[in-house]
């Protein structure tokens, strides 16, 4: 395989990514690839730089130095909205749903980067706008079904915690991402909810061809679902490889996995 073929197989390439806050180096010269149709997990202790790296991938933070290429294009200076339009979606550690909107309307809200109707068309309810709205509602319902959400008209705040987490993923899918960033999606879940969400993440790859970058502290989830795992410590990459390789890395066993290595 040529270098060009290798590059073409990566949906995201990060080179020398560094982020400095004042005198604190939060992420230090990290190289990182995400292959197409893969699940890559980013692990490390609190303060390792994982969420900072996420925020730079999504465009919420500017890099201090280094570069990102997405789908072969340099996106280093693109903001979050532009990257979302190109196909980078994300969820956050804390649930950010519209609590007094229905599950369906929450997903519709996630389609704002894809809808083409104009304000004038919306005011006068043009045929094109009505057709786009029907199609959007059908697609939102399909995404709720895919995520396993039954109560389409239920307020988001009244859904179970597990359903709220899956609703966040459904809303992120509404923007038609090619790469989806999931920041601790199983946090606070019981084992049954975790199993359902883990299965959903796997289906993103298998059924929709979406690449996933995952921050996750539950090592059983990381080791069971990831194609590759990268470990950060104090903002630096200390290990990278297939789950079985990372699992056997003495630095990782000592610093991050601990007793979870047997899980």
Please describe what each predicted stretch is.
Residues 2-263:
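Glycine-rich phosphate-binding loops of nucleotide-dependent enzymes
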